[in-house]
Amino acid sequence: MASEKKLSNPMRDIKVQKLVLNISVGESGDRLTRASKVLEQLSGQTPVFSKARYTVRSFGIRRNEKIACYVTVRGEKAMQLLESGLKVKEYELLRRNFSDTGCFGFGIQEHIDLGIKYDPSTGIYGMDFYVVLERPGYRVARRRRCKTRVGIQHRVTKDDAMKWFQVKYEGVILNKSQNITG
């Protein structure tokens, strides 16, 4: 009876807090600006540029050089983009795509699979999708006044996230040994 009561509690419902789309080009310049245009076209928001933390001579990357761009999407737009991204992956994710904190991420090879028309001047970019899940009440950890921690029982675990993915999207979770072709 206690477990049935726990499942019917609306505070236990899991929702998407945010979706982060990331394109890591590995160099600054024209390719990075074209990648930012792809993200802007996809999300309708202005992307933010990420800088290299340190110099890697073998890759030709200097410290503080802009090498990637990302955009954080929330709300209904995040759900639409997540749906289209999962459609490209055919609703199949690996078990290792899920973190212990209840987040998950995956990548796609070509942005044109999301429904954007191919533009020869832009090219084709792959991107990463990172999804952060939360329950109602997570605000207590983010607010400015009376900040406190989310209780261990209320946190989203890896198993919770995988179950949410399987129920909401009727997704398939594969083990590491199985290969995904595509």
From Swiss-Prot:
Q: Which GO terms describe its biological process?
A: translation
This protein's major location comes to nucleus
Q: Which residues span the membrane? A: none
State if Electron transport is listed as a keyword: no
Q: Which domain of life is it from?
A: Eukaryota
Q: What GO annotations for molecular function exist for this entry?
A: mRNA binding; rRNA binding; structural constituent of ribosome
Give the location in the cell: Nucleus; Cytoplasm
| UniProt key word Glycoprotein | no
Going by the UniProt record, its keywords in alphabetical order are: Cytoplasm, Nucleus, Ribonucleoprotein, Ribosomal protein, RNA-binding, rRNA-binding
Q: State any further remark.
A: There are four genes for RPL11 in A.thaliana.
What is the name of this protein?
Answer: Large ribosomal subunit protein uL5y/uL5x/uL5w
Q: Which organism is it from?
A: Arabidopsis thaliana (Mouse-ear cress)
